[in-house]
From Swiss-Prot:
The gene is gpsA. It holds the Pfam family NAD_Gly3P_dh_C. It comes from Aliivibrio fischeri (strain ATCC 700601 / ES114). The active site is at K202. InterPro entries: 6-PGluconate_DH-like_C_sf, 6PGD_dom2, G3P_DH_NAD-dep, G3P_DH_NAD-dep_C, G3P_DH_NAD-dep_N, NAD(P)-bd_dom_sf. This is Glycerol-3-phosphate dehydrogenase [NAD(P)+]. Catalyzes the reduction of the glycolytic intermediate dihydroxyacetone phosphate (DHAP) to sn-glycerol 3-phosphate (G3P), the key precursor for phospholipid synthesis. Its main location: cytoplasm. It comes from the Bacteria.
Amino acid sequence: MVTMTTQTDYSDISMTVLGAGSYGTSLAISLARNGAKVILWGHEEAHMNRLEADRANEEFLPGVAFPPSLIMSTDLEKSVQASRDLLVVVPSHVFGLVLGNVKPFLRDDSRICWATKGLEPETGRLLKEVAVEALGESHSLAVLSGPTFAKELASGMPTAIAVASPDKEFVKDLQEKIHCSKTFRVYANNDFTGMQLGGAVKNVIAIGAGMSDGIGFGANARTALITRGLAEMTRLGVALGAEAETFMGMAGLGDLVLTCTDNQSRNRRFGLALGQGGDVDSAQEEIGQVVEGYRNTKEVWLLANRMGVEMPIVEQIYQVLYQGKDARVAAQDLLARDKKSES
């Protein structure tokens, strides 16, 4: 078992990162590079043993050595209690489960930030609602979101992201801990709702962009889809009380463009496979990692229907993923819609 032992010095831990996938690991590496002591917790003992033995994540982040101040752990209780600040980086479909497991070990002063992008499965609820239900309202909450690929972040390539929380002191502290003037810029944002929504919707639109390219429609179609996808994202956000300008920032347009245009994106590659004639199961198997956008599509579709917000791109992607519609037919149906005003 990879755990902090009695010999492990876990005083002065700056942050505990919960989730040792590629993105959680890359964030933990970035934090530790700033000179802070950071715990990276994961629940799979074999995986964590391998990370500790290699002092790297050779499967998904090859060639990126762990900083000496990065500590591996599978002990959830010690990991949670060692730091006031927790950064949750797990898939959205297990977000509530992980928080429920964390709750018994929280300190009175614990603050929780998440970099998970998505909504609650089967309900489409924002993750803030899930967090409050799991943890109560006595802990500060924050969301970290923006255009980041794990490999580039871990490699120290220049990256910018945003953080939002109702607790302004928490935002300031997170900026201090995460921001690195050389490679990693962190912007403060006041829109807690919009910051949560952008990361979920962009995953769905990225699948659509991949489908478009897989069919062979070219750059014009991809750009139109991104632009109209941004309009759908903004409409839903405003209906939920978010600020429209948030979606022109890091967690909206920034993340959307990145995910729709680069093949490092699992969601885009998933869509490419579908556009080229693959089915959902074979496309997911081809990716080999969690494709958040698959679940996000149903979640966003549920939320849009509940709010009465028209999202025709999301509707067509939902029909492809969950109702067996052919991607080419979905594209034709989008193009055949009645003439509309752009606004």
